[in-house]
Amino acid sequence: MILVVGLGNIGVEYENTRHNVGFMLIDLLLKESNFTNLTNSKFKGELFKIGSSLLLLKPSTYMNNSGLSVKAVNDFYKCERMIVIHDDIDINLGALRFKKGGSSGGHNGLKSIDTLCGNDYERVRIGVGKGENVISHVLGKFKPEEEITLSKVLEHTKKALLELIENDDLSAISSKYSLKA
């Protein structure tokens, strides 16, 4: 079983914020797939299954406690592989990077996952840039002119993710799909 986690915060006030690009990508995947809804309170998030071996998770624990949801799903399904999609303020909007393991880079959602599940998982890092105030920047909504770039990046990321799921070759996917901005 492969677990793909899209990080974000629940609630209308967080929709379309920079911190929610992980949720946005999961929503894009669901829009174009036949899925089974496995959401259950024990998973502390929205959980969906595509085919026989792909799980998509949107934790409902808020960003700083994402690891609680990821651990609950991982413990129940014994996933062999995990891919986490998240915003990254250290790369510009329009950029896309791939990584396996390493530090959380100060991202509280990753920090929570690392603490509860370890850090040996693949990461899809979607650039959102860095504002003057980090918290208000990541919790802020995209500007209309940024939404055009975001839409293109999410579509590109979806293709990369689907290929990564099939091929399990992060290095090749990184070479083929990484974007600079």
Curated annotation (Swiss-Prot):
Family annotation (Pfam families): Pept_tRNA_hydro (PF01195)
Compartmental location: Cytoplasm
Catalytic activity: an N-acyl-L-alpha-aminoacyl-tRNA + H2O = an N-acyl-L-amino acid + a tRNA + H(+)
Active-site feature positions: 19 (proton acceptor)
Site (Stabilizes the basic form of H active site to accept a proton): 87
One MF term in the entry's GO annotations: tRNA binding
EC number(s) per entry: 3.1.1.29
Organism domain of life: Bacteria
One GO term describing the cellular component: cytoplasm
Site residues by UniProt (Discriminates between blocked and unblocked aminoacyl-tRNA): 9
Catalytic EC class: hydrolase
GO BP annotation list: protein quality control for misfolded or incompletely synthesized proteins; rescue of stalled ribosome
Residues engaged in binding tRNA: 14, 62, 64, 108
Transmembrane feature ranges: none
Keywords from the named record: Cytoplasm, Hydrolase, RNA-binding, tRNA-binding
Function: Hydrolyzes ribosome-free peptidyl-tRNAs (with 1 or more amino acids incorporated), which drop off the ribosome during protein synthesis, or as a result of ribosome stalling.
Family listed: Belongs to the PTH family.
PANTHER family: PEPTIDYL-TRNA HYDROLASE
Subunit structure: Monomer.
Name the record gives this protein: Peptidyl-tRNA hydrolase
Species the sequence originates in: Campylobacter jejuni (strain RM1221)
